[in-house]
Amino acid sequence: MAATTANPEMTSDVPSLGPTIASGNPGPGIQGGGAVVQRAIKRRSGLDFDDEVEVNTKFLRCDDDQMCNDKERFARSDDEQSSADKERLARENHSEIERRRRNKMTAYITELSDMVPTCSALARKPDKLTILRMAVSHMKSLRGTGNTSTDGSYKPSFLTDQELKHLILEAADGFLFIVSCETGRVVYVSDSVTPVLNQPQSEWFGSTLYDQVHPDDVDKLREQLSTSENALTGRVLDLKTGTVKKEGQQSSMRMCMGSRRSFICRMRCGTSSVDPVSMNRLSFLRNRCRNGLGSVKEGEPHFVVVHCTGYIKAWPPAGVSLPDDDPEAGQGSKFCLVAIGRLQVTSSPNCTDMSNICQPTEFISRHNIEGIFTFVDHRCVATVGYQPQELLGKNIVEFCHPEDQQLLRDSFQQVVKLKGQVLSVMFRFRSKTREWLWMRTSSFTFQNPYSDEIEYIICTNTNVKNSSQEPRPTLSNTIPRSQLGPTANLSLEMGTGQLPSRQQQQQHTELDMVPGRDGLASYNHSQVSVQPVASAGSEHSKPLEKSEGLFAQDRDPRFPEIYPSITADQSKGISSSTVPATQQLFSQGSSFPPNPRPAENFRNSGLTPPVTIVQPSSSAGQILAQISRHSNPAQGSAPTWTSSSRPGFAAQQVPTQATAKTRSSQFGVNNFQTSSSFSAMSLPGAPTASSGTAAYPALPNRGSNFPPETGQTTGQFQARTAEGVGVWPQWQGQQPHHRSSSSEQHVQQTQAQAPSQPEVFQEMLSMLGDQSNTYNNEEFPDLTMFPPFSE
């Protein structure tokens, strides 16, 4: 029973096991007490139901509490997870933001270091603090605080203010001006505004910049001068990049000190006269730029396009106070524009002077040694009209005037001998329009540095278009070289107007003393009274047959413009009577008597009758005396004179008889005889003391040469030794061909044969410059024939 009673408790405790046990005990003991059990079960059935409800409710409460706890726990875990995620995300975002910020700052500082010159010049990359410090120093230097003293004046290191100003204005080709930003009043303008705008400084001082610009540009100028943020509206064109930007992007910088201004406006051009000295190449460019806006109507102002660039500066500067009478003094601190105005280069096609200024006047060509074109500059089309392919492979002589072809050939031969030196020659060039253009060609040779051989000749051909320059006349129309004296070595293209003043006076003096054939009718000598003589000889007018040997370049390379200028067609016949009276053909011996007398000493081998010795004018004696003193003493020998003992003689001139046709005259001076292809002569057109002498022919052109002697040998001019007489050293080994027999031409031949006398022409020029000296017998100790006289 106890067990039975215990079973219900057990069943009550575990209700799910009660029915199972009751139903699972069909034994008699259980069956015998089944009623009780059933009753007990029945009796407690309600209680069992309540217990089950209570047990169920207990389990439900436990489940609810557990679920609530789980929910709370899960809720707390979700909150914690979300907060942790938020914190993690926040930390990640902050790190990312900081990393991006550091990257941006590094990029900006790197860009700043590239912009600062002191940073970029360092060998290794500086740290950020150094970059910032150098950037601040650079900004201070840009604002001028680094080079200004306490009074605010600029102190350059090595230039003064005036030198710096002139250098800046010359380099910029413009003018400097300072304008008040508030009122537009011109504070300062440089004097270079006159050559740029043809306006004096006085017109700018006291006026405003608005008065100087075009009326349509006043508003734009006011916007550029304004420093307020709301002054500009709309969009702004950046001249540097060519992009259109909104003004809001730059408005914050308009009040910044040192902000840059760059704009284009039209300024009024004045009519003041410009100094001719300042009319240089830049002035031509200015005139071309001024014409860029088209033609100017009568009575209307002329405007030109000016590009203004500058910076906004504080005015007055720090530490500088304006005077009380200044109208701007009471307005307090303000700003001003410091800018440079330059003429904007225009490319307007309607410029009338573009064709004249921009048309090239020269071109470069390359030739071989024969003168054939191997390269031609493209500017030859505008200069001479030919295309480059039309000139390539052709000789430049083919385009030269026939009278100048020999001159051009000789110049090419001469430039080859000069080896790198520049040689200039002037000739007439045939253009494509069949016109003759005066061309000045400056040529030099290019040598291979390894083989030292001449590769080609480079020529710069310039078209001379100066109408005031007279063309070079032919040789037949020029003054004879023998009369020009020291000016004979000048270029043929130079006229008498181009000679130095001293040489002009020298030339006029000699021309007065040696008159032409038109002015030789009356010539009175102070010592000898002579009568007019005349002669005619056909043999003396024969042309020179070997002029090319006479004027070859190997005679004297220092005079390339004298010898090549004589062409074959210009060599005319000349008679021996064309020798001027003031020039000596050769020197005589020292055995002349002091008084003039019939020339028994001169014997022409029976061909020449006795004639009268005529004393020439004093200038010839002076010239020959000075030439003889400066001759080379190294050539002196026993029968010849040295530079210290050789006296100078005037020419003792005798007439040549017309009957001497087969051989030239021979002169006997005591025992001194020499054969010559020419004869000395007295002054034509002057009276002589002898009435039976033959007459000389009239003077022909002086520009040609003496006829050669038939059958003469090359050694015909070699002097023969004699007693008490000497021979000029330049006659030894001399060629048989001579030009007009003047002392200057003999000196040239002497120089060609005596290289030890390189300065004889310079000495001769210096000697002939002053002819005012007085010569007497003291200067001629070996002569008694010259009485004291003064010129």
From Swiss-Prot:
Residues 167-171 are annotated as: Mediates the transcription activity and dimerization of the AHR:ARNT complex. Residues 112-168 are annotated as: Required for heterodimer formation with HIF1A. Keywords: Acetylation, Activator, DNA-binding, Isopeptide bond, Nucleus, Phosphoprotein, Repeat, Transcription, Transcription regulation, Ubl conjugation. Disulfide bonds: none annotated. Changing H94A: Reduces DNA binding. Residues 1-14, 465-490, 498-508, 631-646, 653-667, 742-756 have a biased composition (Polar residues). Residues 112-264 are annotated as: Required for heterodimer formation with EPAS1. Residues 539-554 have a biased composition (Basic and acidic residues). GO terms for molecular function: aryl hydrocarbon receptor binding; cis-regulatory region sequence-specific DNA binding; DNA-binding transcription factor activity; nuclear receptor activity; protein heterodimerization activity; protein homodimerization activity; RNA polymerase II cis-regulatory region sequence-specific DNA binding; sequence-specific DNA binding. Residues 88-128 are annotated as: DNA-binding. Residues 424-467 form the PAC domain. Changing V305D: Markedly decreases heterodimer formation with EPAS1. Markedly decreases heterodimer formation with HIF1A. Significantly destabilizes ARNT?s heterodimeric interactions with both NPAS1 and NPAS3. Compromises SIM1:ARNT heterodimer stability. It holds the Pfam family PAS_11. Changing I168D: Highly reduces transcription activity. Impairs interaction with AHR. Impairs heterodimer formation with EPAS1. Impairs heterodimer formation with HIF1A. Changing L112E: Impairs heterodimer formation with EPAS1. Impairs heterodimer formation with HIF1A. Significantly destabilizes ARNT?s heterodimeric interactions with both NPAS1 and NPAS3. Compromises SIM1:ARNT heterodimer stability. Required for activity of the Ah (dioxin) receptor. This protein is required for the ligand-binding subunit to translocate from the cytosol to the nucleus after ligand binding. The complex then initiates transcription of genes involved in the activation of PAH procarcinogens. The heterodimer binds to core DNA sequence 5'-TACGTG-3' within the hypoxia response element (HRE) of target gene promoters and functions as a transcriptional regulator of the adaptive response to hypoxia. Monomer. Homodimer only upon binding to a DNA. Efficient DNA binding requires dimerization with another bHLH protein. Interacts with TACC3. Interacts with HIF1A, EPAS1, NPAS1 and NPAS3; forms a heterodimer that binds core DNA sequence 5'-TACGTG-3' within the hypoxia response element (HRE) of target gene promoters. Forms a heterodimer with AHRR, as well as with other bHLH proteins. Interacts with NOCA7. Interacts with AHR; the heterodimer ARNT:AHR binds to core DNA sequence 5'-TGCGTG-3' within the dioxin response element (DRE) of target gene promoters and activates their transcription. This is Aryl hydrocarbon receptor nuclear translocator. It comes from Mus musculus (Mouse).
